């Protein structure tokens, strides 16, 4: 019986095992072999994207895993080897409670294969399951606290993630809402200069856009954007390009710190030095008051809403120099649970307004979505244009829309 080919395009080029996009052509039932005794049988395709493919496999020991099969090109190999090095560093330091666990790495037919634990849905998929109505305070509080725990651990090792976003935060346990952070391909281990953009655009810090040397505070900015999106249901700064992105940030706060505009090597691209730096793009009509109204419009606890607003505004300080670090932000009053049992019960059982029956009854079925990719059913419509999900949580089609430029 002919095996079902999972890779598209499925035509191999010449005598190679790759298609025209440098992806390994794989079929259900094929094996990815590290050696003669250690093989992984391919069960299903979990996602495809800019850097390659992710397949669900079962190992020789019967354990199900997710394997990233990287495109057969040096630039993608180098990118993913950066993630391998950082994941090994986290594993060596026993810091895998908040991060995806790397299990193995090997080469197969000139493709880098990264074996990782199988996880659940990412937070964007989970948000989609709420029909973008957003999460409630107990659930959001649980998630933000864990992300900050992970960020504190990263800071101890001098690691800057550089691509925090809902797609790169996966649910490891639906009963406790345990999450894990994935995708360290863009991560760095020291403060960086301003020679290239990092971060997906919706979550990109102003210092990165302006071309100012950045550090771990850029991750704090991303966290603030994530917090708003998870609660309200849509991104805070859905910029179409960097001009639109910095314009939305500028519009929300009314202005940006003068020293950032003076020292940003890209400032002249967005601002004209006339009467104190005039923004050259179209004005944004979404103000700080609009942001507060959106949060309060959900009709939840006013006290919680107000504390969340204060939390987000601390994380979203336009100046990276006064933005709090992860340890400081983790002690914010919004994250302090007043009634632990009540909060936990609500976070674990209410599912933030998500219908109970959308959660698979059996945990093995929960593992059907993994590694930051959305698993569309045959009846499901394609993901909307603003987020073309890829293997590594990075936009598909050359990072168009929210991730590019």
Curated annotation (Swiss-Prot):
Catalytic activity entry: L-seryl-[protein] + ATP = O-phospho-L-seryl-[protein] + ADP + H(+); L-threonyl-[protein] + ATP = O-phospho-L-threonyl-[protein] + ADP + H(+); L-tyrosyl-[protein] + ATP = O-phospho-L-tyrosyl-[protein] + ADP + H(+)
Protein kinase domain: residues covered: 40-335
Pfam families assigned: Pkinase
Subcellular location: Cytoplasm; Nucleus
Catalytic EC class: transferase
Cross-referenced InterPro entries: Kinase-like_dom_sf (IPR011009), Prot_kinase_dom (IPR000719), Protein_kinase_ATP_BS (IPR017441), Ser/Thr_kinase_AS (IPR008271), Ser_Thr_dual-spec_kinase (IPR050494)
Record-annotated active site: 163 (proton acceptor)
Native species: Encephalitozoon cuniculi (strain GB-M1) (Microsporidian parasite)
Protein name: Probable dual specificity protein kinase YAK1 homolog
CDD domains the record matches: PKc_DYRK_like
Enzyme Commission numbers on file: 2.7.12.1
Amino-acid positions noted as binding ATP in the UniProt annotation, renumbered to this chain: 46-54, 68
Role summary: Negative regulator of the cell cycle acting downstream of the cAMP-dependent protein kinase. Part of a glucose-sensing system involved in growth control in response to glucose availability.
Keywords: ATP-binding, Cytoplasm, Kinase, Nucleotide-binding, Nucleus, Serine/threonine-protein kinase, Transferase
GO cellular component: cytoplasm; nucleus
Gene name of the encoded protein: YAK1
